[in-house]
């Protein structure tokens, strides 16, 4: 937890705040700027939207920290939930997620949002404190021309309070301590894993290193943000190995997901790589673009990003419940080992295994990318309409831009990308998308509702 160690005097407002690292939150230059601003604004220059600004900073910080897509769903929810409760706590328009409104009436909402985002990011990425503090000082300095120093300081204090409360709340969500390594059925019986069961998959090319233990098993039992339990929307089991549907999907993977000699077009190969990045960050960039185009206010953005990112976090938890309930094998295992000897090809390698990340190190069903994307798409369609057009870039295929005429177009392409990458069966993607949408629908009806709106029911 962050505690006050150093006192700053901003005019007549005493404000205590220093990070645990020892780096002061407000630099001397910023303090001077606030004091010069005086009791009234001196310029009518609207500062940048602090929500969009710090969503961008969050995205950059997550990438710089090398955070994997699963853990990133928790990161973006922590940041957005803190920002929302900080903003909403000053002028309540919605039900709070966790922190009840108790801010001074004169506190700056913008300063509260900035501080809340900063606190969470420094808690999560202490190695980036210097960079984040520079962003903080720039953001707060931009407020000095339009808001009173006392209002800014009160907003910062409230933002800190909210972020500390959200941080303490989620420290007990089950993220730590990590459970023992999960190696599939082998870890339980000490023998060869059963047909159809996940086991560690080869990692890295050209030499296909031994597999690693399953990633994030604690997410399968993590306390959700809004859902009543991880299994609330648990999917039915994956396709039976002796079903014609499974045979069709296995054949599709064998032909379309292989690294060499596949039936893919160049565009299909590209889109598999394009969507191999961090799911939560794709959708935060999409939401930022649409928000800017539609002219949402920063308070509307605080609500939108909290709703989307909390939905994605709960979708990830629901997805991991399914992964570690069914423990279904990855295509590389299914094709190399085979349901029968006639089905097997021990030389088969997925297309994405030629790139960093490759086959994800956790059970196959359902698809995490599709589940989280389904949640985001549902939330954004409710805000902007299903047929909102947008473009998106990718950290895994720099310089490329893909365009979409609807959210369904995007989630359909994401499903194709996982199949063409050779890492998911199609049913896993289709059902994962449905799971994510179910989670987001529930979150939208049971959390962050407008004041006086009970969500029209308590059903699950």
Placement of each model-derived feature along the sequence:
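Acidic/polar surface patches and capping/hinge elements
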Residues: 45-458
